[in-house]
């Protein structure tokens, strides 16, 4: 009993000893796990290629090698714990990459709205390295980044294309009118050509104005067409009129070509002008050659108003129409009146009517010619002087009382018979006498019978 009682305490004593031994062994195991825990943490970053397949064999073998007699069950669960935080970290990285891609897309869209048409690849290149540098945890998983990079590259290539239609169209310069002339020389050339072709077609300037009013709804006056042909309009107005006149000219020429082949309807219908207007077409203008014009000028200098027979003769000589020659002479006479209006109507006395008195003209001796007033007065003064000298010599000179007679007075002059012919009737008319003699002028004031108080010395008579 004593032995049994002694044995019991020994057994009891042994159990605490074994418990103490186990407690002593367990701290070593805890220290091993504590010592190996950081190693596992250090080894996990080294095995970066496969973060999802973490093998706990290394730590478990260590624990078994250090304490093969110890129980390995409680030491196995701690190693998988460090692998669990990597899964949320990878998910965070994926979400971070998606956020970076969304931010990049927003930036690209903002740039598209603000600055359309610019290339967006340089800011994307700056964004990608920054995202890669700010997320170093994404480097051990390159396969996870292939899809976002491809989608971002596709966005880079597709978004500028989508932005192309949104670009505002460039302000194009207004196209210049194809018929607008560039300078004044072209306008001058067109004005000359237009006038020649209009005359060739037989249209007047008024016809052109009416036809253009019929076509374009705005009547142009004959003055406007005339000023256009004479280049008397402003450059702007001529530029506006040029395409309209050119279109009318082309239409008129086309119509004249078509009308050169008469149809039955045209033969039966009355003559119509351009665009259905009543026939106002005139005869084509006749162009007279230079040699014919010289011949007509010579004929005009010879006779300004030929008769009908003379006009017919001139037309046969020049191989022209009689009406053309007649119109030319009429126009030439009008031109002569404008150039020299005085020579057109010479003042010739008619044989049956008495000539009217003019202060500038005097008709001596039958009115054969005209003499100026100064020449007529000089001839009259010469005649008066001759007559007065002849009268003075015919009268006897006054004699004083002589001797031997007792101082008798001389007889009066009126008792002496006068041999002076009676003066004709005095008149101031300058009309010629029927005998063609000079006009008689009263010489009553020059009569020598008035006494000795003469105001001239009579010349001696020389028979």
UniProtKB/Swiss-Prot annotation:
Residues 373-394 are annotated as: Leucine-zipper. Residues 179-253 form the POU-specific domain. Its main location: cytoplasm. Residues 41-60 have a biased composition (Polar residues). Residues 1-87, 159-182, 259-282, 341-376, 393-463 are annotated as: Disordered. It is found in: Cytoplasm; Nucleus. Keywords: Activator, Cytoplasm, DNA-binding, Homeobox, Nucleus, Transcription, Transcription regulation. Residues 12-37 have a biased composition (Basic and acidic residues). One of its GO terms (biological process) is mature B cell differentiation. Disruption phenotype: Mutants show normal development of germinal center B cells when infected by influenza virus. Highest in B cells, but also present in brain (neuronal and glial cells), intestine, kidney, and testes. Transactivation activity is enhanced by transcriptional coactivator POU2AF1. It comes from the Eukaryota. GO terms for molecular function: DNA binding; DNA-binding transcription activator activity, RNA polymerase II-specific; DNA-binding transcription factor activity; protein domain specific binding; RNA polymerase II cis-regulatory region sequence-specific DNA binding; sequence-specific DNA binding; spermidine transmembrane transporter activity; transcription cis-regulatory region binding. One of its GO terms (cellular component) is cytoplasm. Residues 75-85 have a biased composition (Pro residues). It holds the Pfam family Homeodomain. InterPro entries: HD, Homeobox_CS, Homeodomain-like_sf, Lambda_DNA-bd_dom_sf, POU, POU_dom, POU_domain_TF, TF_octamer. Interacts with NR3C1, AR and PGR. Interacts with POU2AF1; the interaction increases POU2F2 transactivation activity. PANTHER family: POU DOMAIN, POU DOMAIN, CLASS 2, TRANSCRIPTION FACTOR 2. Belongs to the POU transcription factor family. Class-2 subfamily. Transcription factor that specifically binds to the octamer motif (5'-ATTTGCAT-3'). Regulates IL6 expression in B cells with POU2AF1. Regulates transcription in a number of tissues in addition to activating immunoglobulin gene expression. Modulates transcription transactivation by NR3C1, AR and PGR. This is POU domain, class 2, transcription factor 2. It comes from Mus musculus (Mouse). The lineage of its organism: Eukaryota, Metazoa, Chordata, Craniata, Vertebrata.
